[in-house]
């Protein structure tokens, strides 16, 4: 894991990443940006659910031009979830599936 400077990422970068996810669809988005589906949390935006780590990693790429690997940063409560909540986004724990 590397030390990522999240201060360059704004709500606009995150919104742009969400738009990219909607435009490409999950499969192509993950293939293009190097992430996978979420396992524990969802970013909730306009009543839709998104993978927080993938969205934040892509937002970082939009903000800095630097691509992050999934292994470069944490996605949980002390990682992507915390950064997105600090930017004012809603994060929800995924519902348990049986």
List each language-model region with its residue ranges.
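Intrinsically disordered, charged low-complexity linkers and terminal tails
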Residues: 1-98
């Amino acid at each position: 894991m590397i030390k990522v400077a999240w201060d360059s990422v704004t709500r606009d970068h995150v919104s742009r990443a969400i738009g990219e996810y909607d435009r490409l669809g999950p499969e192509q988005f993950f293939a293009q940006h190097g992430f996978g589906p979420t396992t524990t949390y969802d970013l909730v935006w306009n009543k839709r659910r998104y993978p927080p780590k993938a969205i934040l990693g892509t937002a970082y790429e939009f903000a800095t031009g630097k691509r992050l690997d999934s292994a470069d940063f944490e996605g949980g409560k002390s990682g992507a979830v915390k950064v997105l909540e600090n930017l004012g986004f809603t994060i929800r724990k995924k519902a348990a599936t049986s």
